[in-house]
Amino acid sequence: MELAKSFDPKDIENHWYSVWETAGYFSPAKREEVNAYCIMLPPPNVTGTLHMGHAFQHTLMDALIRYHRMLGDNTLWQPGTDHAGIATQIVVERQLDQEGKDRRQMGREAFLERVWQWKEESGSTITRQMRRMGTSCDWSRERFTMDEVLSRAVTEVFVRLYREGLIYRGKRLVNWDPVLQTAVSDLEVVSVEEQGSLWHILYPFEHRAENGEKGLIVATTRPETMLGDVAVAVHPEDVRYRHLIGHHVRLPLSERTIPIIADSYVDPAFGTGCVKITPAHDFNDYQVGLRHKLIPLSIFTLDGKINDNAPVEFQGLDRFDARKKVITDLQAQELLVETRPHKLMIPRGDRTNTVIEPMLTDQWYLAMEGLAKQGLAAVESGQVRFVPENWAHVYNQWLENIQDWCISRQLWWGHRIPAWYDEDGNVIVAYDLEEARKLSGKENLHQDEDVLDTWFSSALWPFSTLGWPEQTPELKTFLPGSVLVTGFDIIFFWVARMVMMSLHFTGEVPFREVYITGLIRDAEGQKMSKSKGNVLDPLDLIDGVALTELIRKRTTGLMNPKQAESIEKATRKQFPQGIPAFGADALRFTFASLASHGRDIKFDLQRCEGYRNFCNKLWNATRFVLMNCEGKDTGLDEGLPLNFSPADKWIIGRLQQAEQSVIQAFNEYRFDLAAREMYEFIWDEYCDWYVELAKVQLNSEDEARQRATRRTLVRVLETVLRQAHPIIPFITEELWQAVAPLAGKTGASIMCQPYPQPDQLRIDEQAAADIQLLKEVVNACRTLRGEMKLSPADRIPLLIEGDRARLINFFPHLQALARLSEVDILPGGLPDTDAPVAVVGDFRLMLKIEIDVKAERERLNKEILRVEAEISKARVKLDNPDFIQRAPEKVVQQEKGRLVTFSTTLKKLDEQLRKLD
C-alpha cells in the first residue's frame, strides 16, 4: 500500500468514519461473559452547536471508549440530545418574531408542532459535528429527552414521587425571568458585577421623634422594592437601635406602617445598619420573613411591572421606570438622605440578559432531604468515586445544605406536568387523562399548563436511556455505568440529581466514577465567551477558516454590537492569516495533552500546530518503514534466523515501559500523561533514534540482522499505532492498514485489535545501557560540532579515550548519526593538543581538527560551571536528612551515583582546562 507523500487529514477522516459507522463497530459486543463498560454522553442541547468544552470532553470520552473496546470490554457509549426547554423555545420564538408571529396567538398545539418541525430540521447539527471529531457513540441507540420512551419514564417518575408524598405544590420565592415569564434555575442565572447606587432613605417613626431623630435611615440598592417592604430589620446587638425594636416606622410613599424587628442576618457595618425587609422580592428577606411570620407583599406582575398592591401612582409602571419615580418622589418629600456609587452583583438571565427578579409564585417542588441522604451515602461508601477526589467535597457540601427543588417551568416546550384540575381546583396526578378521570370521577378536567425543569428529565438519563421502567437486558448490563465525564459547574444540577434519582428508582448508582474535567479557557486564561470575542469553533480548527469568516462569526449576534470593532481588531492581530486546518487528530491530541487534573485549562493554538507536526512525523516514519520493508522479509517466517541488535532490544524494551505508562495513565484519567508518553516515545525514541539506527542496520551485510531490524521496525510501529488509536483514531487507522500485514496482523480495522500490553521480560537492561551510552556519545559529538561551528556537510574523524569493547560495535552508528568520517579509540589516551574534549562518563571525546584555544577555554569553563551546579544540587539533596529518610532507596542510590559521575566529569574537565593553559 502506497501512502501519499504528505498527511492530508480531510479525506482520511471522511472515509474512515463512514467505514466504522457502517460496519457497526460502535455498538456493544453483546457478549455477557465479558466486562461491561458504559459511558453516558452528557446530552448537549438540541439547539446547540459543538463548542470547545464539548469537543474537549467528547475527546476524553471517546479515548476511554476506544481504549476499553480494544481491551475487549463490552462497550456502550450512549448518545443523545436534551430538549433544552428554555433555549429551544427562545430559538423558535425568535424565528416566529421574524415572521411577525406570536406563540400566544398561535396557541400551544400549533406552537409545539412548529418546535418539533424545527427539531427535525435542525436538531441533528451537533451530532453531525460530533462525528467530525471521531466520536464512536452507538448512534443506533441515540435518544432524545422528549422521545416516547424517555417521556414515559419522566411521567412514571413524577407520578411515583407524587404518590410517595415527595412532590408537592406550593408558593415560594423563585428566580423569575420577566421576559420569558418563567422560573429559571440558578444555573441559568449569571451574576455580573455592575456599577449601581446605594440610596439612603429616611423611614419616619410612626408617632414621634426618638432622641431627636426623625426616623431610621435605611440603605438599599433597589428603592423600587420598598413599595413591598413589610419591616425594617436591625441587628439585635446593635446598641444604636436596640431600644427601637418593636416600634414602627411609616413606609415612605405609602399609607402603611411597618415594624422594626431584630434579626442577626443584618450586618451592622453595612450602610446604616438598618435593612428594609421585602420577603416577596429578596431571597434573604424571604427567610427573615419566615422567621418573623411576616406576610410577603408581592408588588410585581409576571412581566416585571408594578401591580395593584402598590400605591396607584406606581401601578403599571415598568420596574425600572418605577425606580426613577420612587427616587424623584423621595427627593420631593425630602426623604432621600444620600446617594452613593456602589458596585454590586446583578443577576441576569443567561438567555435574555434581563435582570432576574425573585418572585413569589405557585410552583411544583420535589422534597430533597431523604433523597440527599441516599446521595451522600453513595459517595461516603465509595459506591461513587470522584476524580479528582476533592470534588466529592463540593458534592457533599451541596447535598448537606440542599433545598427542595422547584421542578416546574412556565413554558410550553418540555414535559408537561401530569396533573389535572377539576372545576373546584382539586389536583389529580395521573399517568394520563383517562386515569385522572377515573381517579376523580369527573369528566371536565384541565391539565396543568406548566412543564418540568429540563434537569428533571436529565436526572433520569442514565437509566431512562436503557429502557427503564422496563427491565431491559441493557439496563441489567450497563447500569451502573462505568464513568461520567463532565464539568464541575453541573455537579449540583446534574451529577447529584442523577445519583439520587437512580438510587431511588433502580437501587443502583448511575455510575461508579465521576471524572471532573477542567474548564477550557483561552491562551491567556480568560473564559471563552461571545462577548469577549475569544470563542474558537472546534470545526474551524479541524478544517481551517479564513480571517474574514472568523471575524464574521465572532462579531455576529453580539448582545452589545459596540464590541464588534474591538473584537475584530483583536482577531486580526491574533490570527492575521486566519486559522489553518489542523485536522481532527491534531485537535484531539491537543485536548488530551491538556487534560490534567487542574480546574482551568489554557488552550494554546500553537499546541495544535505542534501536534499536527507530530502527525506528520508519524506519517513520514511510516512511509520510511513501508519503503524499506514492503516486499521484503519482515521476519514473519519464525523458522528463519533473527539477529537482534542492542538497538532492536532497546526499542522493544522502551516500548514495554511506554505501554505500562500509558495504561496506568488511562486508568487514572491522566490523559495528559498518556499523550506525553506517546509523543515522547514516537517522536524522540522511535523516530529520532531507532529509525536512524535502523538505517545503519539495514545496510548491514548480515541478512539475519536486516530481517530482525525490519521486523522490529514494523512491529514496534504497528504496536504504537494501536496504542495511540484511542486519541488519534483517523491517522492510526489509515497507517495501520498499511503496516499491519507486514507485522503479521489481520483484521478489518484497528478498532477491533487488542490494546498493547507490556511484557517486562522483554526489557533488556544491558541493551538499554548500551544505547544510552551511544546516545550520550552522539549528543556529545553534536555539541562539539555546534560549538566548533562545523557545517553538517563536514565529516570529521572522532578520537575516543576509553573502554574499546563498549563502543566498538557502534562505530557505524556513531559515524552515521554524528556525521563522522571515522572513529578511532586510542589505547594510550587522547593526544595532548588544544582541541576541545567532551566527557561522557569514563570516555573522553575529541574531534580531530584545529581549534580556537580561546573559544575552547570558554566552552570548558561554561561546562565546568554547569557540572559544579549539578554537584551542588546532588549534595544539597544528600545532605538533607528528610530526603535520605523519606525517598525510596533506589532514588537515593541514583542521586549518589549522579554525584560520583559529575565529580568524575569535573575532574576530567579540569584536566582539559589545565592542558589548554
Curated annotation (Swiss-Prot):
Reaction catalyzed: tRNA(Val) + L-valine + ATP = L-valyl-tRNA(Val) + AMP + diphosphate
Gene Ontology biological-process annotations: valyl-tRNA aminoacylation
Binding locations of ATP: 530
A single GO molecular function term of this UniProt record: ATP binding
Superkingdom of the source species: Bacteria
A single cellular component GO annotation: cytosol
Assembly description: Monomer.
PANTHER family: VALINE--TRNA LIGASE, CHLOROPLASTIC_MITOCHONDRIAL 2, VALYL-TRNA SYNTHETASES
Record remark on domains: ValRS has two distinct active sites: one for aminoacylation and one for editing. The misactivated threonine is translocated from the active site to the editing site.
Identification of the protein by name: Valine--tRNA ligase
Species this protein is from: Nitrosomonas eutropha (strain DSM 101675 / C91 / Nm57)
